[in-house]
Amino acid sequence: MSHSYSVPKKFPTTVVGSYPKIGPASEAIKKRRAGEISEEEFHRIARESIRMVVEDYIWAGVDIISDGEQTREDMVVYFAERLEGYREGDWVRVFDNVYFRKPIVAGRVRWVRPMIIEDWEYARSISAGRPVKFIITGPYTMLEWSFDLHYGDRRELIFDLARAIRREIDEALARGAEYIQVDEPALSTRPFKEEAELLKEALDIIFKGVGAKRIVHICYGELERILPYILDYPVDQFDLEMKNSNFRLLPYLKEYGYDKEIGYGVIDVHSFQVESVGEVKEAIDRLMKMDIVGPEKVYVDPDCGLKRLPRDVARAKLKNMVEAARLAREEW
């Protein structure tokens, strides 16, 4: 692929991963679940949706993009359906009126074949040289958001999940992946030292010897309670929700001497209100004035995935975010 695109050294812009389902993706998900189309046909149909997502990112000016996770009905279920050892579960309420089919671990979890490589590679082929993050749900979130009827031992299960995830990451690394992001939203729901340490052991398996940029995304919850226990994770960057919680975490980052890169969430993905350029710029200024890390370590992005927003709102939010980052480069 071409590497003609130059990612800014200060305040590069990126996304957490998901994007509103557009084009034929939603219908293709239903047809695949009903057994009306094959896995191969499913991904082929979804290419049109991925193309539209990438076009939106390029239009907005985002530097490091994703495939928009257009084939993922759910961040856990998608992988559970493609790993050996899982079977389908029943509907479980997550929050408000949001439900998902909580999968069941019924046997030994193993990687069988590439799960998200095809979508990611297609996005790379049409990205106009922009890097495309390889984004996968992490072992702790897979563990927490599944029913275990086989292992009876959380450590055994999370380590098998970590090995399966690493196998998928190896497929991406062999194809030149530059940014590897592991999503762990479940960690903030159990903000305890022992849970943070369990995930660290799993991440040691996932990231050992990985030369690409290693990123972990965590969002919401009381992350400040476990911040001291995650700072030594084998990662280059933590991608963090900030806007929705009114940047509550910033003083804690300062207190604990945070020095890794930060994916700095400046867009509230739960609000349909589009942040102004000035509002986003002010959020960036707020971080810089605290002198936690330099501008070369700040990746400007939304709090979380954009999938629950209308497409026009997502586009507008990204456009303003990119412009705010550009202005910040001129100042900082």
UniProtKB/Swiss-Prot annotation:
CDD domains: CIMS_C_terminal_like. It comes from the Archaea. Its EC number is 2.1.1.-. Transmembrane segments: none annotated. Pfam families: Meth_synt_2. Zn(2+) binds at H217, C219, E241, C304. Pathway: Amino-acid biosynthesis; L-methionine biosynthesis via de novo pathway. The keyword Zinc applies. Its cofactor is Zn(2+). GO terms for molecular function: 5-methyltetrahydropteroyltriglutamate-homocysteine S-methyltransferase activity; zinc ion binding. Keywords: Amino-acid biosynthesis, Metal-binding, Methionine biosynthesis, Methyltransferase, Transferase, Zinc. One of its GO terms (biological process) is methylation. Belongs to the archaeal MetE family. This is Methionine synthase.
